[in-house]
């Protein structure tokens, strides 16, 4: 359903719901929105991305389908961090428009998984310890992702510092970020 929301805004061919559309042709008229906001490791021939990093407030403004507020559930009733099996599990049950608006951990863009992860939770002595690595694209001892290619990372240009990328109005088409 989230993909349908994205397609409603981005796919013009055969879409009877398009109200305003403007075509851009590289040799005649261009814009830089996709260029400046594409997911970091999916840039084509540029070094720019993540000009707009959606905030947690925006993500949490999308309520859950059961009618509850959109606040992400990251701690249990005992104030312990919840460790999810998959990065996308924390977003389960959210309004599908979130997917059409924001690239968040555990999703894809252009059919490619995005790597948004800031560390790992390690089970030791009956509790989880959180471990981070400042190196983008790093792997933990077990071969899994430690810190994703796409961040988040503070104070680094062209990398999301919030853990989210904008999806809405960023074209998935080849050459859109060139």
Each language-model region and where it sits:
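Active-site beta-strand/loop architecture of penicillin-binding DD-peptidases
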Residues: 138, 144-178
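An aromatic- and glycine-enriched ligand-binding surface/loop that stacks and positions planar moieties
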Residues: 1-148
């Amino acid at each position: 359903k989230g993909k349908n929301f994205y397609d409603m805004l981005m796919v013009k061919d055969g879409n009877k719901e398009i109200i305003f559309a403007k075509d851009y042709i590289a040799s005649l008229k261009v814009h830089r929105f996709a260029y400046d906001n594409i997911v970091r490791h999916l840039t084509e021939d540029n070094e720019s991305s993540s000009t707009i990093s959606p905030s947690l407030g925006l993500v949490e403004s999308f309520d859950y389908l059961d009618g509850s507020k959109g606040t992400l559930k990251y701690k249990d009733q005992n104030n312990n961090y919840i460790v999810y099996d998959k990065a996308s599990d924390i977003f389960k049950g959210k309004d599908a428009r979130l997917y059409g608006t924001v690239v968040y951990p555990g999703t894809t863009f252009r059919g490619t998984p995005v790597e948004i992860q800031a560390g790992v939770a390690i089970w030791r002595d009956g509790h989880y310890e959180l471990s981070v690595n400042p190196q983008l694209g790093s792997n933990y001892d077990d071969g899994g992702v430690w810190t994703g290619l796409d961040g988040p990372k503070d104070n680094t240009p062209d990398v999301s510092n919030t853990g989210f990328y904008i999806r809405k109005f960023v074209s998935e088409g080849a050459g859109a970020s060139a």
